[in-house]
Amino acid sequence: MTDIKDFFIASNTVHNAPDYDSNVLSTLIHTVEAFARVTYQSIYLIDYYKQEYLYVSDNPLFLCGHTAKEVKELGYSFYLEHVPEDEQKMLVELNSSGFKFFDTFDNVDKYQCSMSYHFHLKSGTRSKLINHQLTPILLTDEGKIWVGMCIVSLSSHKTVGHVEFHKNGLHNYWKYSFEGHRWKECEGIALKEEEPEVLRLSAAGLTMVEIADRMCRSIDSIKFYKRHAFDKLGVTNITEAISRATLNKLF
């Protein structure tokens, strides 16, 4: 049975109290609140010193029927209540491996790093697969993550896991293997100039004929671009393709 303390290890436990400047935290929360108002994603902040949620947006995607205030008060108990038990174990392992990997970067680079993974949230008899991203917002003087921002959206995958670690500005990224319990560097996805354009126009509702006319290409060429984009992204439909391309900042 997973316990809240299982989520906190040496790499993400802050022992020395940070400087809790109320103005800094207030400005941070107001900034995140403003971002939450204009995005479809759910956002919350984790305080790793107090080991609690600092802020939770009111987007219902993450809340599982609770209010934002209730989820904030639940803190990490929310995971124990709304994540399937076998996936809780996955999150504990990921939490440990992910924060140890964060520690391999210097303090400047840590601010450029983010981790992305997929798991289910259950509410009653219903369950939904989400994409969960974590990135540092504030570090302690020792380089520990003090405040982390989490962004939640619907997953474009069909299964859990798919853990990726990205550093802004790097083409390559790292994937985590639960079988090998290690990180592996992978070559980043690269789309040809025409491929994201085909995806974008497809998402806008244009037919193959209309896209071909817009891009001054043959229909066979459009089919070729679309098929190759799907193959590179590892998807089978346009919804997944748009989601995966957006996540990988390919537009």
Segments (PLM) and residue ranges:
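PAS-family sensory domain signal
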Residues: 20-76, 170-178
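Short alpha-helical "packing" element that flanks the helix-turn-helix/winged-helix DNA-binding module
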Residues: 195-202, 241
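Short, low-complexity N-terminal regulatory "tails/caps" that precede and couple sensory modules
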Residues: 1-19
